Amino acid sequence: MALCLILLPTSGAFADVGAADEALPAAVKATAADEKTKPALPVPVNAKAALLMDASGGQILAQTGAHEKLFPASVTKIMPLLLVMEAFDRGELQLTDTVKVSADAAKKGGSQIWLKEGETMTVDELLRAAAIYSANDACTALGEHLAGSEEAFVAALNRRAKELGMNDTNFVNGTGLDDTTDEHLTSAYDVAVMSRELLKHPLILNYTTVWMDSLRGGATQLVNTNKLVRTYPGITGLKTGTTNKAGCCVSASAKRDDLQLIAVVLGSPTSNDRFDGAKALLNWGFANYAALTPKLDPALVPPVAVLRGTEETIQPVLPQIAPVVLKKGEEGKLQQEIQLAVDVQAPVEEGQALGKVIYSIGGKALAEYPLTAPESVGKMTFGEMFRRLLGALGK
C-alpha cells in the first residue's frame, strides 16, 4: 500500500477567547522525568499538585507534581458520575429509574443527604445529590444500583480507570472517604483524564453547573460545594473534595468560545487556596491560549483505488475535527499533514483506516484524526474480473 503525503498550513475559524477575567487527539502527557524537576507553575497555586489541561485534545498546558499519588477525597466521584453517564449511553439506566436505598448506603458518613434504609429515590435525584452536594450516601446508592454491590462498583471504577490509562489510580470506594484506608489514591493527571472523559457527556452539565437545588419537596436543600459555579465566568463544573488526609481538592472546568480547560488542584491547605489556585490556572489558560478549528478541504482527500475490489475506488470519510489549542499568536504556524493511501487491496472493511490527518507546530503533533472507509468493498470474483477486463478492451 503506497502513501501520499500533503503538508500545508491550515485555515480555520480562530476563536480568540480574550483575557480571562473563563478523532484521535494526541494527548501531551507529563512524564516521570517531569516529576524529578517538579516544574514551576506560571501562577501561584498553594497545593501539593496542580495541572491545567485542554479538554479538547488532552494537552497539558501547565503542571507540577502531575503524577504524584495523592488522596483525592470526593473528587473521586468524577469516576462514578462517568460510569453513570456511560450507563445512560448504553441504555442500561434511565433518569426516572427508582433506587431503593440499602443499609450500607444509608450508613455512609461524611457529606450526605441522610438517606434511610428502604427509602426510594430516582436516579435523577441521587445524581443531583452526588454531583451538587457531594452526598456519599447518594453516590453509594447509585453505584450499588448500577453494579449490584459496592464491591462490584469499585471493581468497575478501577477497570474504567485502567482503560483510560489512569496508571496512578487505585479506588477503594466510590466516595473518596479515606479515614480507614491509605490506598485510595490518584494523581492530578489522572483526575484531569477522568474529568475530560466526563465532559464528553453534555448531560452532566445539567448537574455540575447548578448552584442550588432541593429534594424531598424542598425539605432537603442542596448547595454546590464548588463555589466557582456561582462566581467564575464560563464554569462547567466539576467536583470538589476535602478530607484531613487529602486536604482541599478541586477539578474545575470552564469553557469560553471553543476553548475548554480543566484545572486540577490537589492537597491545598484551605478551601480558598484550592479555588484561588484553580481560578488562577484557568485565568492564565484563557489569557494565553486559544482554540483554532482547522478546515479540511475535501479536495485534498481524493478517492483511494481498491485493487481487485467490486468498486474501483473508495472515498475516505472526513473526520469531525475538534478545536486545536494553541498559544495565542501561533495560529499561523499550525500545519496540516494528510497521509493517504494511493491504493488498498480488497476486501476493505467499513471503518478501515485509509490514512490520517495530523496537525502540528514545528514538528510537534498536537492532534491526529483517521481517514476511514465509509463502507465495505468486497473482493472481485474471477468472473467479475473477466467481465471488467472485457469491458475495458471493448472501449
Task: Tell where the protein language model's regions lie, with residue ranges.
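Bacterial N-terminal signal peptides
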Residues: 1-9
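Cleavable N-terminal signal peptides
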Residues: 2, 13, 17-18
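Active-site-adjacent loops and short helices of periplasmic peptidoglycan-processing enzymes
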Residues: 16-202
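Domain-terminus/edge residues, biased toward the C-terminal soluble/receptor-binding domains
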Residues: 166, 170, 182-395
